């Protein structure tokens, strides 16, 4: 098994549950790391490959739902909740905040394995998206200051002549910058560049000339 093989992170204060879940998941070829508390989990090194978090709701140091809230916004593994005291409000809250599933003990092996598979697939997809975004940011970092001025103008729909006038450049010079922007951003077309700008959340620059003429 490779070091970057999928791993399931179990957080449950019951050692019998941790052992049973570990045996089941390992029998299906998955790596497992088990923790008795949220604090133990928080102190561990983050996984380097696809992962999911099997999280008990009732923990000795913090409620699992509270931990989910604390992790919000961070690049944490997708969560599958497990609990012996499930209720509708808790399950709705968990799913609303991004949990893949909410399983009430005792749950069947098939239900658990299906939830884990879905969570691992989600994490694999999210990791790929983050890697793509990181590469895109790296390409954007290669643009010169002038090219960063040109990019929002051309994705806003301005013609070369209009964008050139906006920046006080000749149209020929603007076209050179435009070609460089497309090449450095790895965009085969203007549509590709627009999508890249949207992913990078680059604000569209509206022509000051247009505003004066309006």
Where does each model-flagged region fall?
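Acidic catalytic/metal-coordinating carboxylates
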Residues: 36-37, 63-66
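Active-site residues of response regulator receiver
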Residues: 56, 83
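Basic, Lys/Arg-enriched C-terminal extension of HTH/homeodomain DNA-binding domains
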Residues: 182-214
């Amino acid at each position: 098994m490779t070091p970057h093989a999928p791993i399931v992170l179990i957080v449950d204060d019951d050692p019998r549950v941790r052992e049973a879940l570990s045996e089941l998941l390992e029998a299906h070829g998955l790596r497992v790391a088990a923790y008795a508390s949220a604090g133990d989990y928080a102190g561990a090194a983050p996984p380097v490959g696809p992962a999911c978090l099997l999280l008990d709701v009732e923990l000795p140091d913090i409620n699992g739902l509270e931990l989910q809230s604390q992790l919000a916004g961070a690049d944490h593994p997708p969560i599958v909740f497990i609990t012996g005291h499930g209720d509708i409000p808790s399950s709705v809250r968990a799913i609303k905040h991004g949990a893949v599933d909410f399983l009430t003990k005792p749950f069947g092996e098939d239900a658990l394995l299906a939830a884990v598979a879905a969570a691992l697939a989600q994490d694999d997809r999210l990791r790929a998206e983050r890697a793509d975004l990181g590469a895109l940011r790296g390409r954007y970092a290669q643009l010169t200051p002038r090219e960063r001025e040109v990019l929002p103008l051309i994705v806003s729909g301005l013609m070369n002549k209009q964008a050139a006038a906006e920046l006080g450049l000749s149209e020929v010079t603007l076209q050179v910058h435009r070609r460089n922007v497309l090449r450095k951003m790895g965009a085969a077309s203007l549509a590709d560049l627009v999508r890249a700008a949207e992913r990078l959340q680059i604000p569209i620059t509206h022509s000051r000339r247009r505003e004066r003429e309006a």
